[in-house]
A protein has these predicted regions:
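Bacterial N-terminal signal peptides that target proteins for export
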Residues: 1-7
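Hydrophobic helical h-region of N-terminal Sec-dependent signal peptides
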Residues: 8-9, 13
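Sec/Tat signal peptide C-region and signal peptidase I cleavage site
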Residues: 15-19
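Catalytic cores and adjacent binding grooves of peptidoglycan-active enzymes
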Residues: 20-37, 156-301
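Solvent-exposed N-terminal domain segments of exported/luminal and surface proteins
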Residues: 22-58
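Active-site acidic/histidine clusters and adjacent loop/turn architecture
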Residues: 52-120, 182-189, 196-199
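Extended, low-complexity, intrinsically disordered C-terminal regulatory tails
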Residues: 101-133, 203-225
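Envelope-exposed proteins and targeting segments
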Residues: 114-119, 140-144, 198, 232-236
């Protein structure tokens, strides 16, 4: 059963919009839909065309992979200790709780591991919801991808933010990290993030989880929050719990209390997990699958 759950999670979290995908300096607006009120219209086509947040009270509505975001806030593209990447995606939107969390976390990074700051990947679309490419989650404004590459001690150009690749920490055989790229600084950052009370989970590649299990010393309780899943070899994924004032937000069940470093982790390196059979494509999600409040979010001016 756990193997089946893990395979399902792979589909929930992975997708083509990974940190190493290039962006564009000249993003083209999407053409209008011929019949946006058609019940069969994929929800991603509707939310993917929303270019500004819904001017409503901040609320995360629904579940991480089946919901939307009211009153989203933009993480500024530049901060003292962060820079937003792939600006052409317009995915630097989040619940104000996530934006505040990233600002506070980034300010601590130089003390945590000596990096100048964080390179921030995808958060959510302006109104959350399903995305045209990539992530099945990131719909509530409570998920954020952080590159496994230190922020340079300078401002990146727009072209660099669209074209440079993140650092792949995982060996080609996917069995462990690349010792030439994985550093104690990665462990220190992931440990600091997982210890934050607001953080519900931190998703990393199984090979990175294996390295953390091997190298962590002292208090290891934080390892329970670090969950393995495929992808996530160029970035790690922060997930916050439902914030106050979001009564329609549904949190995940707490992760198991164990470190997740024994047989539970070993399963990820079996042939069935390393070489899974392709699954059948799922039909795209429509608005009927989302909470009714998401219609109000889309309809807001």
């Amino acid at each position: 059963m756990r193997l089946i759950h893990a395979l399902a999670l792979m589909g929930c979290l992975s997708g083509p919009a990974l940190a190493q995908d290039r962006g564009t300096l000249n993003p083209k607006p999407l053409p209008p839909l011929a019949n946006p009120n058609d019940p069969a219209t994929p929800a991603k086509e509707l939310f993917g065309r929303a270019t500004a947040p819904a001017p409503l009270a901040p609320r995360a509505i629904g579940f991480y992979s089946r919901g939307c975001l009211a009153g989203g806030a933009a993480l500024p593209i530049d901060g003292p200790n962060w820079q937003v990447m792939r600006l052409s995606r317009n995915r630097n939107w989040g619940h104000p709780a996530m934006v505040s969390f990233l600002q506070r976390l980034s300010a601590r990074v130089p003390q945590i591991n000596g990096w100048p700051g964080l390179l921030v990947g995808d958060l959510a679309q302006p109104r959350g919801g399903p995305m045209l490419t990539g992530h099945a989650s990131h719909q509530l404004g409570l998920d954020a991808d952080i590159w496994l590459t230190p922020m340079p001690d300078r401002r990146l150009s727009r072209a660099e933010r669209e074209e440079m690749s993140a650092t792949n920490l995982v060996r080609p055989d996917r069995l462990d990290v690349d010792p030439a790229r994985y550093t104690p600084g990665h462990l220190a950052l992931l440990r600091a993030v997982a210890r934050e009370d607001e953080v519900e989970r931190v998703f990393v590649n199984p090979a990175i989880k294996r390295a953390l299990c091997r190298d962590a010393r002292g208090d290891r309780d934080w390892l329970a929050k670090v969950r393995p899943t495929w992808g996530h070899n160029y970035h790690f994924h922060i997930r916050l719990g439902c914030p106050a004032g979001s009564g329609s937000c549904r949190s995940q069940d707490p992760p198991p209390e164990s470190e997740g470093c024994g047989s539970e982790l070993d399963r990820w390196f079996t042939p069935a997990m390393l070489f899974p059979k392709p699954g059948k494509p799922r039909p795209p999600m429509t608005m009927s699958a989302l909470p009714d409040e998401c219609r109000q979010v889309l309809a807001a001016p």
